[in-house]
């Protein structure tokens, strides 16, 4: 139960639904077709007055719909919200196909959109494994160090 009764009022409920239905405008500028990397690239301005930031997943689907492309080939990144809120600017890339996306996008962005798997284990574990394997120079490397 809330300590503030006005939070559960009818007016507050109406405001919540009004904010959820508020329009989000997406504008693109600096549009460029990059044939070498098999993509279209652009700067995206998202205008969302009175709302929190729009999720990247939602932006991917809306930009895909704007350019008649599948959501899977759209990559969005680098979004910064302007002071005071209401406007966010970032970048979008629309690839010709999923293979081009997998070839040219950085691995961390592929992990974020679910097209690649994050590396297992931490940085320290990888370094320790590398150094263990270096100890046996000149002999066949195995997972377990040899007992002498």
Curated annotation (Swiss-Prot):
Organism: Mucor circinelloides f. lusitanicus (Mucor racemosus var. lusitanicus)
Family note: Belongs to the eukaryotic ribosomal protein eS24 family.
Biological process according to GO: translation
Keywords: Ribonucleoprotein, Ribosomal protein
Listed name of the protein: Small ribosomal subunit protein eS24
GO cellular component: ribonucleoprotein complex; ribosome
Any coiled-coil regions, as ranges: none
Chain intervals with Basic residues compositional bias: 121-148
């Amino acid at each position: 139960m809330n300590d503030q009764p006005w939070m559960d009022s009818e007016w507050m409920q109406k405001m919540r639904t009004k904010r959820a239905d508020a329009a989000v405008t997406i504008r693109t500028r600096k549009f460029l077709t990059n044939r070498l990397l098999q993509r279209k690239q652009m700067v995206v301005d998202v205008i969302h007055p009175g709302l929190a930031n729009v999720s990247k997943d939602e932006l991917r689907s809306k930009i895909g719909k704007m350019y008649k492309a599948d959501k899977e080939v759209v990559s969005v990144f680098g979004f910064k919200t302007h002071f005071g809120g209401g406007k966010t600017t970032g970048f979008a890339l629309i690839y010709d196909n999923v293979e081009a996306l997998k070839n040219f996008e950085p691995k961390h962005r592929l992990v974020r959109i679910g097209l690649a798997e994050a590396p297992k284990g931490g940085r320290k574990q990888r370094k320790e494994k590398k150094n263990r394997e270096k100890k046996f120079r000149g002999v066949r490397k195995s997972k377990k160090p040899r007992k002498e």
